[in-house]
């Protein structure tokens, strides 16, 4: 049985929207949420190929690609909000049937 999603997440089969603890600037616009689309195999492979074996950089590249924002925007998040994004990603890719 899977754990229920936290209240700061809005989850669909196609994406997850993460409510940030405070608004932040993403692509030059103040935003209170970040939406990540579901990844493809190509997304996963591309993130790995551009990270030079650095797992943290691979994750940043992947999240930035899925949210259509710059890596620098992700790096500007508070650690609490980055953890919310990572949690959202984990719920998004979780297989409910397992």
Indicate where each model-derived feature is located.
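Short, surface-exposed, charged amphipathic helix/loop patches that serve as local interaction elements
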Residues: 2-98
């Amino acid at each position: 049985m899977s754990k229920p999603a936290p209240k700061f997440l809005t989850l669909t089969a196609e994406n997850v929207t993460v409510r940030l603890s405070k608004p932040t600037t993403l692509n030059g616009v103040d935003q209170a949420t970040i939406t990540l689309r579901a990844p493809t195999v190509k997304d996963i492979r591309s993130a790995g190929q551009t990270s030079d074996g650095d797992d943290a950089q691979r994750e940043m590249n992947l999240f930035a690609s899925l949210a259509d924002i710059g890596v620098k925007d992700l790096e500007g998040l508070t650690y609490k909000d980055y953890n919310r994004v990572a949690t959202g990603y984990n719920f998004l890719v979780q297989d409910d049937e397992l």
